[in-house]
A protein has these predicted regions:
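A beta-strand edge to alpha-helix "cap/lid" segment located at domain peripheries
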Residues: 4, 59-146
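Short, flexible active-site loop motifs that bind/organize anionic cofactors or intermediates
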Residues: 16, 42, 115
Length: 146
């Protein structure tokens, strides 16, 4: 059971290793009532698979590619924990941004993501981009209606 949930998370993360998101595949990997909190605790929770896809699409307007290097994965029950190094290349200036991320995923019995939380240092990213913490907060504020 745990291996299948971990595999579902690995497959889900692999969908983001691209310049153009396949929103149909992302939506299929999510439970209809899934939730996503892109930056715990600062960003608002995004509710629903369609809203999550819209928010992911919005974020992909900022960068042109993404790579999630999975360092560690573990699970307990329906929860999968990941330790990653994420790299994105910004559209504006072609700058590469690298950050350490702890992702926590709740996975249902159908191996779909029902709750996705990401923990990373927003100020580290702000420093790499060259913006203030407040500007970074505004950039990461989820833009979808809840």
């Amino acid at each position: 059971m745990a291996i299948k949930k971990e595999a579902a998370v690995k497959q889900f993360l692999a969908l983001f290793h691209t310049a153009a998101l396949d929103l149909a595949k992302i939506r299929a990997a999510l439970a209809p009532d899934a939730r996503w909190q892109p930056v715990v605790p600062l960003a608002n929770v995004v509710y629903g698979a369609d809203a999550i896809c819209r928010e992911a699409e919005r974020q992909y307007r900022i960068y042109k590619d993404c790579d999630c290097e999975l360092l560690n994965i573990a699970s307990a029950g329906d929860t999968v924990f990941t330790e990653r190094v994420d790299r994105v290349r910004l559209l504006d200036g072609d700058k590469e941004i690298i950050t350490n991320v702890a992702g926590v995923f709740t996975v249902d019995d159908d191996n779909r993501i029902v709750f996705w939380r990401e923990y990373w240092d927003m100020l580290d990213i702000a420093d790499q981009i060259g913006v203030s913490g407040e500007t970074m907060r505004e950039m990461m504020d989820t833009q979808v209606e809840v």
